[in-house]
Curated annotation (Swiss-Prot):
One of its GO terms (molecular function) is oxidoreductase activity, acting on diphenols and related substances as donors, oxygen as acceptor. One of its GO terms (cellular component) is photosystem II. The keyword Aminoacyl-tRNA synthetase does not apply. This is Photosystem II protein D1. It comes from Prochlorothrix hollandica. [CaMn4O5] cluster binds at D170, E189, H332, E333, D342, A344. The chain crosses the membrane at residues 29-46, 118-133, 142-156, 197-218, 274-288. It is a multi-pass membrane protein. The D1/D2 heterodimer binds P680, chlorophylls that are the primary electron donor of PSII, and subsequent electron acceptors. It shares a non-heme iron and each subunit binds pheophytin, quinone, additional chlorophylls, carotenoids and lipids. D1 provides most of the ligands for the Mn4-Ca-O5 cluster of the oxygen-evolving complex (OEC). There is also a Cl(-1) ion associated with D1 and D2, which is required for oxygen evolution. The PSII complex binds additional chlorophylls, carotenoids and specific lipids. Residues 345-353 form a propeptide.
Length: 353
């Protein structure tokens, strides 16, 4: 009898826990994805903060020349970073227990893998949690679809690119100047500025910013007057009110006359779908571009494409970009190799006659 009561009590406790996890009445929704998301993101955040402040230098190139990234080793907020794991580790999974000592783990950049893997699992689960909450509230699932764009971008630079290049040392450093260094080296090695998918991503991000500003300014300029000139116009809106707070007909008429009629949306639902879809699709394409360049399917090469009738090269923007790429190439990882492949493969100019 006692055993049966204890089983019923434990079952009730489990049911209560399940109900609490899945309850939409909590101040912050937890969800089953949240059960994984919360510890992984906390782990990534705590390890990142500690490593950013106090991690010792990391032998990123695997040539016994450690690179310092933490604040305690002379960096500031701009120059500091969690340095990627060593090229000597390559693509090996490198948890703490794989190293002979904590010093070795830190020297080889173990914290980078710990932060990145927990962070990726955390943001995957955050996306799943968005779907889960939408499902329980009876909403459509497009919020998590939109969030998949930055998730895809993070996955591309932290996971797909290192996998394609053969080492986590090629992943993006976790810092401001480290991010810029990653971008410059990526341009040097893959000519990303000449990749059409990157161009679509630029159009998505800049276009999304433009459309967001246009939409916000149009709505703000066509608000229905509910307040006096001495009050904030924000007091003219009450949360949950049924009537429109701005005149979409006036906004449509203004924009249609400013450009032309069919450049202006007359359907609020179609407009907001467009505002969401444009940057999301652009970032999807950029993520896909990085994922293809990870395997060295690089941007277009139009070097020395234009020549005069005598066969002399007429330099174009592509040639200027190529020279910049070579400059980036020779400046990064200076001691890891004597000559970059691009320069070593060039035939030496003749000095005879």
């Amino acid at each position: 009898m006692t055993t049966a009561l204890r089983q019923r009590e434990s079952a009730n406790a489990w049911e209560q826990f399940c109900q609490w996890i899945a309850s939409t009445e909590n101040r912050l929704y937890v969800g089953w994805f949240g059960v994984i998301m919360i510890p992984t993101l906390l782990t990534a955040t705590i390890c990142f903060i500690i490593a950013f402040i106090a991690a010792p230098p990391v032998d990123i190139d695997g040539i016994r020349e450690p690179v310092a990234g933490s604040l305690m080793y002379g960096n500031n907020i701009i120059s500091g970073a969690v340095v990627p794991s060593s090229n000597a580790i390559g693509l090996h999974f490198y948890p703490i227990w794989e190293a002979a000592s904590m010093d070795e783990w830190l020297y080889n950049g173990g914290p980078y893998q710990l932060v990145v893997f927990h962070f990726l699992i955390g943001i995957f689960c955050y996306m799943g949690r968005e779907w889960e909450l939408s499902y329980r509230l009876g909403m459509r699932p497009w919020i998590c679809v939109a969030y998949s764009a930055p998730v895809a971008a993070a996955t591309a630079v932290f996971l797909i690119y290192p996998l394609g290049q053969g080492s986590f040392s090629d992943g993006m450093p976790l810092g401001i100047s480290g991010t810029f260094n990653f971008m410059l080296v990526f341009q040097a090695e893959h000519n990303i500025l000449m990749h059409p998918f990157h161009m679509l991503g630029v159009a998505g991000v800049f276009g999304g910013s433009l459309f967001s500003a246009m939409h916000g300014s149009l709505v703000t300029s066509s608000l229905v007057r509910e307040t006096s000139e001495n009050e904030s116009q924000n007091y003219g809106y009450k949360f949950g009110q049924e009537e429109e707070t701005y005149n979409i007909v006036a906004a449509h008429g203004y924009f249609g006359r400013l450009i032309f009629q069919y450049a202006s949306f007359n359907n609020s639902r179609a407009l907001h779908f467009f505002l969401a879809a444009w940057p999301v699709v652009g970032i999807w394409f950029t993520s896909l571009g990085i994922s293809t360049m990870a395997f060295n399917l690089n941007g277009f090469n139009f070097n020395q494409s234009v020549m005069d009738s005598q066969g002399r090269v007429i330099s174009t923007w592509a040639d200027i970009l190529n020279r910049a790429n070579l400059g980036f190439e020779v400046m990064h990882e200076r001691n890891a190799h004597n000559f970059p492949l691009d320069l070593a493969a060039v035939k030496a100019p003749s000095i005879i006659g």
